[in-house]
């Protein structure tokens, strides 16, 4: 016991030493963003961009597959495939925008098939 009547103070480890002791013992968790943060970042990125979103070769195969039903051995210029892809993506982006508005109208943030069906029905599309 000390002459003043108090017990001697314990030495506290420095902040850096404590941090190192914790890090050495455990594996650091990877950083995770809150749900929706990455999605919003992707939405902003794709809204800024003007490039095509669908891969060219899979789209070209799809066009050729559909064209087979109309006529055998059809040939396409690359500019024709590109024009079809531009028009298709323009249509799909607009449809998804309308679908999102239908989901928001229903007080939801997640789009569902019924939202897309409603959007197409309002637009007057069939099938």
From Swiss-Prot:
GO terms for molecular function: DNA binding; protein heterodimerization activity; structural constituent of chromatin. Pfam families: Histone (PF00125). The modification N6-acetyllysine is found at residues 6, 15. Keywords: Acetylation, Chromosome, DNA-binding, Methylation, Nucleosome core, Nucleus. The modification N6-methylated lysine is found at residues 19, 28, 71. Disruption phenotype: Worms exhibit slow postembryonic growth. GO terms for cellular component: nucleosome; nucleus. Acetylation is generally linked to gene activation. It comes from Caenorhabditis elegans. SUPFAM superfamilies: Histone-fold. Belongs to the histone H3 family. It comes from the Eukaryota. This is Putative histone H3.3-like type 3. Putative variant histone H3 which may replace conventional H3 in a subset of nucleosomes. Nucleosomes wrap and compact DNA into chromatin, limiting DNA accessibility to the cellular machineries which require DNA as a template. Histones thereby play a central role in transcription regulation, DNA repair, DNA replication and chromosomal stability. DNA accessibility is regulated via a complex set of post-translational modifications of histones, also called histone code, and nucleosome remodeling. The nucleosome is a histone octamer containing two molecules each of H2A, H2B, H3 and H4 assembled in one H3-H4 heterotetramer and two H2A-H2B heterodimers. The octamer wraps approximately 147 bp of DNA. It is found in: Nucleus; Chromosome.
